[in-house]
Regions:
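Conserved interdomain linker/interface between the two RecA-like ATPase lobes of SF2 helicase motors
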Residues: 1-53
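A short helix-to-beta-strand connector/capping loop
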Residues: 16-21, 68-70, 105, 162
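Structural motif
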Residues: 47-49, 108-110, 127
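Conserved two-lobed SF2 helicase motor
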Residues: 101-116
Length: 400
């Protein structure tokens, strides 16, 4: 900046963060499992980033069942805050910047996108489900993040591990994919990343180049997927067109709802703001804060009774489509439920109160209703997090 004339001055990237990442692909469960087995046998640590919570749970349960000797942990966003903090501490101890060989060796983490955010984690091996290119680049930042020797101990000199390799769990490659190319192998994710053409372009770019250099390749990678001149295969064109139309509609909504800074705080903007209105700051699936309570010995208490913020420690975020209101409960007196609800932040107005009873399987369960008013039983434990009945039954089926 010179006086009142702005200018741009490029800064050199630090040598410690400039690197080449090799990319390979695994188009089956068995291929991913083999890479994890190789990591364990060589005394390395690994992470598999999955695109949905159910997919992460499924991988965690199957791997634990098939390899009981492995040291595996599960990390996603659907844990009560106290449990999530405990998991974060374990994850940082095993994979954080100060972790050593003894803490890292043979450890495996199955996670969702939560590992991309704020935590300083460093894995020897990294596997990710196929995602848009910008997320792939971001996730790769957790691979060989710090300089280490061949055993995984921190060092100051050049990293002594093999070249960082990012494995992408993906559909089988096709030059001419059908509309089912991504939907069939990843049925839970098809509505998370709706533009399947962009996913195909991401895979094509990385296949063609065999990897990428950062930061040199960043612009070419982004433009190679999001550029307007890129050609989408006919089989994926419709899904891409619909996704892009939806994104344009969301952009229009955002434009109409932006604040007019020149008018100050008035009610003349596109959307009137009331004293207690819900004012979301982003578009997307709405989420709800769920306040967990446990019924023990005739008392209803926060699930994690840890003053002074017991209710906050007992809260978990979940999609409103899955849980929108408290369901009927015949075992806990209504007056006790109402009295407990009064203790919640804002008396529970902006969330769902979920009293839980311990089931015969030692998992906590409670009744709720989804966004359409359909009743459901929800389940919670500190290992798997909060589950709908469908998710829980699927989990139990895998464990049998």
């Amino acid at each position: 900046y010179r006086g009142d004339v702005p200018g741009e001055y490029p800064l050199e990237t630090r040598p410690t963060v400039r690197r080449h990442v090799r990319v390979d692909f695994a188009d089956s469960w068995q291929a991913v499992e083999q890479r994890l087995a190789d990591s364990v046998s060589s005394g390395q640590c690994a992470c598999w980033i999955r695109n949905t919570v159910p997919d992460a749970r499924e991988a965690y349960s199957q791997l634990k069942d098939q390899h009981p000797e492995w040291k595996i942990d599960l990390f996603h966003a659907r844990f009560a805050l106290a449990d999530r903090f405990a998991i974060e501490q374990r994850v940082l101890e095993r994979f954080g910047s100060t972790s050593n060989h003894e803490q890292r060796a043979g450890q495996i983490l199955i996670a969702t996108q939560v590992v991309e955010q704020s935590l300083d984690l460093d894995f020897d091996q990294l596997i990710t489900d196929l995602a848009p290119i910008d997320l792939i680049i971001q996730r790769a930042g957790r691979l060989h993040r710090h300089r280490r020797d061949v055993q995984g101990n921190r060092i100051e000199e050049k990293d002594q591990r093999l070249e960082p390799t990012l494995t992408i769990h993906s559909p089988t490659w096709s030059d001419d994919p059908t509309a089912e190319w991504f939907k069939t192998p990843f049925p839970r994710v098809q509505t998370v990343y709706e533009d399947h053409g962009q996913l195909w372009l991401t895979m094509k770019l990385l296949r063609d180049h065999g990897g990428f250099r950062m930061p040199e390749d960043a612009r070419d990678l982004i433009e190679g997927v999001y550029g307007t001149e890129n050609e989408i295969p006919d089989g994926l064109w419709r899904a891409s067109a619909e996704a892009q139309g939806e994104n344009k509609a969301k952009a229009s909504i955002a434009f109409l709802n932006q604040l007019n800074l020149d008018s100050g705080y008035t009610t003349l903007d596109a959307a009137n703001w009331w004293d207690e209105a819900k004012t979301p700051t982003r578009l997307g699936e709405e989420s709800t804060t769920v306040w967990l309570a446990r019924w023990v010995n005739g008392e209803l208490k926060p699930f994690h009774d840890l003053p002074p913020f017991a209710w906050q420690q007992s809260s978990v975020a979940m999609r409103t489509a899955l849980i929108a209101e408290t369901g009927p409960n015949s075992e806990i007196p209504e007056e006790i439920i109402n009295t407990c609800r009064e203790q919640l932040p804002a008396k529970g107005k902006w969330g769902v109160f979920l009293p839980l009873l311990k089931s015969q399987s030692s998992v906590w369960q409670g009744n709720a209703k989804d966004k359409n008013g359909n009743p459901d039983t929800l389940y919670y434990d500190a290992e798997q997090g909060l589950m709908t009945s469908k998710e829980y039954n699927l989990q139990e089926g895998q464990n049998q």
